[in-house]
Regions:
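Class I S-adenosyl-L-methionine-dependent methyltransferase catalytic core
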Residues: 1-145
Length: 145
């Protein structure tokens, strides 16, 4: 639907994309949609939220690379910011089979698989990355106490 609604009548604007990410195809669809929308609406700010999941790290990396390469092909001078908030270490969240978890877990708590969140910003506003990274670093320090 986003493809049909872009470009909007006003040239300036922003869109936040938050796919379900329930299926592997959601990652591919998000990348394809963003590159397509950026080609039609090259001055629009496009924000993509994505989860940081250890078991899908390669899929997420592929999605981000596809978006960045596609948007750079549309405009090699485009500003793209990739911001990440880590609430835990990536390796702290390993996948455990249910049987193994039930038999061997001392505390009976399965470690969460989501270790943070990311936001890819296409046509990011000036100084967004610098000001946001300082803020994110402070939040991470508070969370990890």
């Amino acid at each position: 639907m986003l493809k049909a609604l872009t470009p909007p009548k006003t040239k300036r604007g922003a869109v936040l994309i938050d796919p379900s990410y329930e299926e592997i195809k959601d990652y591919e669809d998000a990348a394809e949609t963003i590159v397509h929308v950026n080609k039609k609406w090259n001055n629009g700010i496009i924000l993509l939220w994505y989860p940081l999941l250890n078991h899908r790290s390669q899929i997420i990396e592929n999605m981000l690379n596809q978006i960045i390469e596609g948007c750079k092909k549309n405009n090699q001078n485009i500003e793209i910011s990739n911001l990440q908030l880590l609430v835990d270490e990536k390796d702290a969240h390993k996948e455990v089979a249910l049987k193994e978890f039930l038999e061997h877990s001392e505390d009976k708590k399965n470690p969460p698989r989501l270790y943070g969140s990311g936001m890819l910003v296409i046509n990011s506003p000036w100084m967004l990355k610098d000001s946001t990274e300082a803020f994110i670093n402070n939040i991470e320090k508070i969370i990890r106490r």
